[in-house]
Amino acid sequence: MRKTIFTLVLALTALTAAAQQRYLLRFNPVLNQVLHYRTQINMTIDVPQVGPMQMQTTIEQDQEAQNMSDRNYIVSTTFTAIDGVMTPTVGTGPSAKGQSINLRDMEPIKALINKPFIMRYNDLRKPEGPLMAETKAMGIDPSMQKMLNSATLPAAFPERPVAVGENWTATMEVQGLASEITFRLVEVTPEAYVVTYDGLMRGTVTETQPGMAVNIDGNISGRTYYSRTTGWEIPGQNNAKITMSMSVPGVMEGMRMQMEVQQ
């Protein structure tokens, strides 16, 4: 009897220790190693007086950490292919005829292909913003440069070690669009930290076009598998969903968008 009780105590102790084990998630990429990602996006946009439109997009991109100093990494992202079609499904006017728009034929899309986009990340996977010289060299519109460089994007990883089932929060703000995102470590495998996230996105974006303000109310959620050794996303296992409503006072009300992402 005493042996049985002792065995149970040991088992409970082991389970408690496992439940309390904490993990330090960090971005520690191998320098000059190129990772290839294929992202598929399915989007539905419902525009008042026009009707819903659907868009399927495939993005091929390479990512590479090229330099490191004081826990900061210079990461190059190169879009090698962007292909997709936007198709109106119902509505009135020209869109009702069902003409499809091929994204790869659009000049702004062509301008992105095979031109490295440089970002700085710290070891929490927090983007510090693009390097201004690089955005200028790419010919990015000045208003877009300002938006990219003023963006406050969330860190993917917490500052402290966390246990499975533990939450942490991060904030994001881009040109008036603010959100607080709750992350949760839901599983640890031999290869990956599995993290889910969910958050609201609300605000008024004022610099899309001169004199135009866009009110946005939405939600973002998803699941990401991060490599335990490098902190990179593990290709082929990640998903996200974004839903939002948008309105331009005096111009358009009730526009809705839903986006599903697989990477």
Where are these regions (language model features)?
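Positively charged n-region of N-terminal signal peptides that target proteins for export
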Residues: M1-T4
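Hydrophobic h-region of N-terminal signal peptides that target proteins for export
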Residues: L10-A18
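Acidic, serine/threonine-rich low-complexity disordered tracts
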Residues: Q20-K97, E166, A170-Q263
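Short beta-rich binding modules
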Residues: S69, R120-N122, P130-E134
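Short, positively charged
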Residues: I101, A133-P142, G203-T208
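A glycine-biased structural micro-motif
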Residues: L103-I118
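Hydrophobic alpha-helical segments, especially N-terminal targeting/anchoring helices
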Residues: Y121, P161, Y226-S227
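Extracytoplasmic beta-rich ectodomain segments of secreted or membrane-anchored proteins
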Residues: E128, E134-V186
